[in-house]
A protein has these predicted regions:
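N-terminal strand-loop-strand
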Residues: 1-41, 69
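Short, solvent-exposed loop/helix junctions and linker helices
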Residues: 9, 47-51, 126
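Short hydrophobic/aromatic beta-strand or adjacent loop that forms the aromatic wall/cage
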Residues: 10-14, 87-92, 111
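Active-site-adjacent beta-strand/loop module that shapes the phosphate/pyrophosphate-binding cleft
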Residues: 19-21, 78-104, 115, 119-121, ...
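Nudix hydrolase/Nudix homology domain
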Residues: 33, 37, 86, 107-147
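The catalytic Nudix box helix
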Residues: 42-75
């Protein structure tokens, strides 16, 4: 699986952690010097060293929320253009989050708050990072809109 391949060239990862009909979101810091200040986003961040996409996502989720992810939680992934670096790519993943993982979150020092938000609310919010809304929508359309 390419998510485990550290030779893949990518800038960073974001992961939508889904628990029932909700997604785990983080309210970004309200600082003018960061992209998308005071907006709801998904866990993740920049690659360190030669991490694989999964290693990058797992490290970021642990740093931001104290959650240990295992590879078996992954449901989907897709490579997209980087949100920050033109001409580079990033990886978007979707994984399952168990209620007990949410209940045991240890919130890190990035962001103002976290919450399990209804997926529909995240997709419609004017206060959510638009690129992440689109990427989550891609997953849902590919996996659930099979009418």
């Amino acid at each position: 699986m390419e998510l485990l391949d550290s030779r893949m060239d990518f800038q960073g990862c974001k992961i939508a952690l889904i628990c029932g009909d909700k997604v785990l979101t983080i309210l970004r810091d309200d600082k003018e010097n960061i992209p998308w200040p005071n907006m709801w986003e998904l866990p993740g961040g920049g690659r360190e060293g030669d991490e694989s996409p999964f290693e990058c996502a797992a490290r970021e989720v642990y740093e931001e929320l104290g959650i240990h992810l295992t590879e078996d939680c992954l449901l989907w992934s897709k490579v997209y253009p980087s949100m920050l670096y033109e001409g580079r790519q990033s990886v978007f993943m979707v994984g399952q989050l168990r209620h007990e993982q949410f209940d045991n979150i240890t919130f890190g020092d990035e962001g103002q708050a976290y919450k399990l938000m209804l997926i529909e609310e995240f997709l419609k919010s004017k206060q959510a990072v638009p690129q992440l809304q689109g990427r989550l929508r891609d997953y849902l359309e590919e996996n659930y809109d099979k009418t």
